[in-house]
Amino acid sequence: MFYSIVAIFVGAGLGALLRWFLSIGLNALLPEVPLGTLASNLIGGYLIGIAVVAFATRAGLPPEWRLFVITGFMGGLTTFSTYSVEVMTHAVQGEFGWALAVAALHLIGSFTLTGLGMWTARAWLAPA
């Protein structure tokens, strides 16, 4: 149990730091669509697609690695709450087009990149 807690704790901290760095570096570029949050969710979608397939095909890996990567790192990196606030901020300001655009970018982009990540992992991990 101790190693599981440490794995989640460290992974979440690293994921949150990456999300913060992405926000610092990207959000000011296009304030209407905070690119740091979008990048966090799209990168996280891609990486979790890879991780899910990798862990499913590598049953011998210690469970702490899955907790570190999926529960911790991806949980710290991706952010539904920030995404929700950014969409609703546009909506309450009457900017419904921007609200819809931000929502669509996150949802379509994340689903697409999660699928691409799964495809990538299957291609990498396929028996030769």
Swiss-Prot record:
It is a multi-pass membrane protein. Disulfide bonds: none annotated. Signal peptide: none annotated. Na(+) is not transported, but it plays an essential structural role and its presence is essential for fluoride channel function. Pfam families: CRCB. Keywords: Cell inner membrane, Cell membrane, Ion channel, Ion transport, Membrane, Metal-binding, Sodium, Transmembrane, Transmembrane helix, Transport. GO terms for biological process: cellular detoxification of fluoride. Na(+) binds at G75, T78. GO terms for cellular component: plasma membrane. GO terms for molecular function: fluoride channel activity; metal ion binding. It catalyses: fluoride(in) = fluoride(out). The keyword Transmembrane applies. Its main location: membrane. InterPro entries: FluC. The chain crosses the membrane at residues 5-25, 35-55, 67-87, 96-116. It comes from the Bacteria. It is found in: Cell inner membrane. Fluoride-specific ion channel. Important for reducing fluoride concentration in the cell, thus reducing its toxicity. Belongs to the fluoride channel Fluc/FEX (TC 1.A.43) family. This is Fluoride-specific ion channel FluC. It comes from Burkholderia pseudomallei (strain 668). The lineage of its organism: Bacteria, Pseudomonadati, Pseudomonadota, Betaproteobacteria, Burkholderiales.
